[in-house]
Amino acid sequence: MPSALAIFTCRPNSHPFQERHVYLDEPIKIGRSVARCRPAQNNATFDCKVLSRNHALVWFDHKTSKFYLQDTKSSNGTFINSQRLSRGSEESPPCEILSGDIIQFGVDVTENTRKVTHGCIVSTIKLFLPDGMEARLRSDVIHAPLPSPVDKVAANTPSMYSQELFQLSQYLQEALHREQMLEQKLATLQRLLAITQEASDTSWQALIDEDRLLSRLEVMGNQLQACSKNQTEDSLRKELIALQEDKHSYETTAKESLRRVLQEKIEVVRKLSEVERSLSNTEDECTHLKEMNERTQEELRELANKYNGAVNEIKDLSDKLKVAEGKQEEIQQKGQAEKKELQTKIDEMEEKEQELQAKIEALQADNDFTNERLTALQVRLEHLQEKTLKECSSLGIQVDDFLPKINGSTEKEHLLSKSGGDCTFIHQFLECQKKLMVQGHLTKVVEESKLSKENQAKAKESDLSDTLSPSKEKSSDDTTDAQMDEQDLNEPLAKVSLLKDDLQGTQSETEAKQDIQHLRKELVEAQELARTSKQKCFELQALLEEERKAYRNQVEESAKQIQVLQVQLQKLHMDMENLQEEKDTEISSTRDKLLSAQDEILLLRQAAAEAVSERDTDFVSLQEELKKVRAELEGWRKAASEYENEIRSLQSSFQLRCQQCEDQQREEATRLQGELEKLKKEWDVLETECHSLKKENVLLSSELQRQEKELHNSQKQSFELTSDLSILQMTRKELEKQVGSLKEQHLRDAADLKTLLSKAENQAKDVQKEYEKTQTVLSELKLKFEMTEQEKQSITDELKQCKDNLKLLREKGNNKPWPWMPMLAALVAVTAMVLYVPGLARASP
């Protein structure tokens, strides 16, 4: 069964490694090389100190046909398109990766001791499905601009701002790569220029040698002509003097021309040294620009990370604010409901208190009225007792006499009725019977009232036990008790009125005494009921006061808590404002740094363009000067005739001057090395400053973490932060505007770089064409030089032969006059002419 394939290719800004082809049959571990696992082309193990041993995992999900990457608690982090997967050394959720993504393992780490930077692994990944088709690209995905985790999509999806920053960083990296290629091209062009200069020097030397040979031939021809002529000593002397004068004039002209050539050569060397210096300066500036670009990229990444962190913090704060607002609303609603309930309870208790006070006053008035009536009744009862005693004493005897008669038959009654007895006595007897019946009825009523009172007392005791229940039940029980008390008070009054009527109708002493006793008992019970009602009223008043005090205490405590919360909210507002000011200052400082860096980049670009233009002008001027020098040399060929010894002396002096120039160049090289050492020292100082800035950054980050902890602790107690959200949203909009301006500036810079690159490429093409032309010219000159050397050798051989012949002739002439002398001179002249004419023909073109 075929398996999915992942190809890791090295980026220019990465630690170097070979291209890896990894088959994803199972989850593949990405990490640092160890003794057991060495880097190979079919694994994801890298020889890099920045990576962890178990840095990350890559696998292919056959169900979803997607590729996933997970950071397994690495120390320096894993990045997908400049977005870190996890915070700190935490395990990240699996994140989807697409073909063409740029994956970074770790970050660049510098050692303080050796001051060596260890690069990280940056690679572009190409993903192929098991069927051989390439996975979808990042540009094909519309909804998700960056890879999202499986579980937490919203938490790890970066914003469009970070994606644009990543694109800008990619453009800058490509521009740096192009600059490196241009620098390499410039270096090759410089080498070609050096080669052409050497070739031109050799060609000049060949031309000088050719002119030298021609001058020798002319001299030899003149000598042959002079020897062939039969002249006297005076004429020979004159010719020798003229020849010596010509020789001196030629020497002076040659010396002047050589001086001019030397001066021009010195100027050319000086210009070349200046060009080399400008080249070194431009290279230094390019390195500085690269470093500044890297720093700006790092700062942009840090700003992007900070921006994403601030966005996440804002989201967390908004969520917490919403939760806090909901809790606050719930608490406020609960407080308002409790407040309303307490107010209603207080109002009800006050109303009940007023009602109870009114009832107490009414009961007191009724009690006073009943006391007055009871006193009046007591007086009447005393009068009635006296009357009844008198009547009972008179009637007691008559009743005893007539009892057997009453118990007798009806016949006796009939007889009595028929007899004309005393009617008044019978009426009195009947009235006594009625009174006895009334007394029995009264006793029954009294017993029933006693039973009802006992039941009421038991009910009151149960009600008193229930008074410890809530205030609503107390108030209802109190009202029922008051009603029962009123009924109890009204009942004895009614009974007293009935008893009055009965006592008025009845005049028995025993019944009156019993009624009086019952009335006294009822009065005592009524007084006790009044006392208990008063005690209940006092208890209710005490409970009301206690509840009022408790409510007041609760209100005071709530007011204090509200004040404390308001103070804490004010403190939180102040802290948030301070943090916002610090963030604004940091953002403004970073903006200033970016602007200054951009200005420096523009200045350096202008300087580089000026240097390139100066190089072009210098190159053109050098070419023109070379043409002039060639023309002058051609003129010197025709006019100059030199001797070998003088030329050798001039060559020696020229060599001495060259050695002096070389010594000067060495001194300049030593001076440049000293300047390099100074620059290295300055670089060390800058590195120390960078380390100090990093330490300050670490301290600032720790302070930020501490402030974040304080914010987290204060967020638990805060409930109102809506104003801060609006301010943060305004700052976010400002940041987005500034980011847009930065993007426009970066795009402009990229366009300028592209134009400069196109110009440089055109210049390189022109230089290549000129180089090809110079190569063709050099090849022709080399051929001519070889031909001239061959001719030179032949001529030197012939000249040696001629010299030998001349020496022999002179010796013979000194010894004997030789008759074949003119013939021999003519022969030598003819041979010289034959040899000289083709040389002139070759030299003339």
Curated annotation (Swiss-Prot):
Keywords: Cell membrane, Coiled coil, Cytoplasm, Cytoskeleton, Endoplasmic reticulum, Membrane, Mitochondrion, Phosphoprotein, Transmembrane, Transmembrane helix. Residues 1-163 are annotated as: Necessary for targeting to centrosomes. The gene is Slmap. Residues 451-463 have a biased composition (Basic and acidic residues). It comes from Mus musculus (Mouse). It is found in: Cell membrane, Sarcolemma; Cytoplasm, Myofibril, Sarcomere, M line; Cytoplasm, Myofibril, Sarcomere, Z line. One of its GO terms (molecular function) is protein-macromolecule adaptor activity. Expressed in proliferating myoblasts and differentiated myotubes (at protein level). Expressed in myoblasts, cardiac and skeletal muscles. This is Sarcolemmal membrane-associated protein. InterPro entries: Cent_Immune-Sig_Mod, FHA_dom, Prot_inh_fetuin_CS, SMAD_FHA_dom_sf. Its main location: membrane. Associates with the striatin-interacting phosphatase and kinase (STRIPAK) core complex, forming the extended (SIKE1:SLMAP)STRIPAK complex. The (SIKE1:SLMAP)STRIPAK complex dephosphorylates STK3 leading to the inhibition of Hippo signaling and the control of cell growth. May play a role during myoblast fusion. Pfam families: FHA (PF00498).
